Amino acid sequence: MRFQKTTEYAIRVMVYLAERADERFSVNALHTALNIPYKYLGRLMNQLAQKGLVTVAQGKFGGYTVEKKSLASTYLYQIVDAVEGLEDYDRCILGFLKCSDEHPCALHHLWLGIRKQIKDMLYSTTLADLVQTEHKTNGES
């Protein structure tokens, strides 16, 4: 299982903004930095702003930002929910509508543990965690 493309883009944008918290970026600047299609990115940023995950300022010096104070309280599940919803993380991995503990599909019991790990990760990982991981990965302290 992997994130939908929109969710991948949303997480990339949010981490980029979180690393530069309190700075403003236009859609064009984000498009250039992250190589996300411009028109697609504009719609995505509007979704994130409507959900309160980014703030937007209009005008010549406007743009999108993530406030530093929100990094530790913005969770990965909120980003996923804002763009694709969380329903897929409760559905049958094979797409059966009536799959349950009482009527399991062939992968049901194997998928339960994996699904729990994914959901635990979504609900316990903050933007602050992702920024910290990104800095460690890039050799920064």
Identify the residue ranges that each predicted region occupies.
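Short alpha-helical segments that sit at the start of domains
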Residues: 1-13
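Key DNA-contact positions within bacterial/archaeal DNA-binding proteins
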Residues: 39
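Short helix-capping/hinge SLiMs at alpha-helix to coil transitions
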Residues: 18-22, 68-70
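A short alpha-helical element within helix-turn-helix/winged-helix DNA-binding domains
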Residues: 28-35
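Beta-hairpin "wing" of winged helix-turn-helix
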Residues: 51-61, 65-67
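Basic amphipathic alpha-helical segments that dock to polyanions
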Residues: 44-49
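Conserved segment of winged-helix/HTH DNA-binding domains
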Residues: 70-94
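C-terminal regulatory/oligomerization modules of transcriptional regulators
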Residues: 75, 90-141
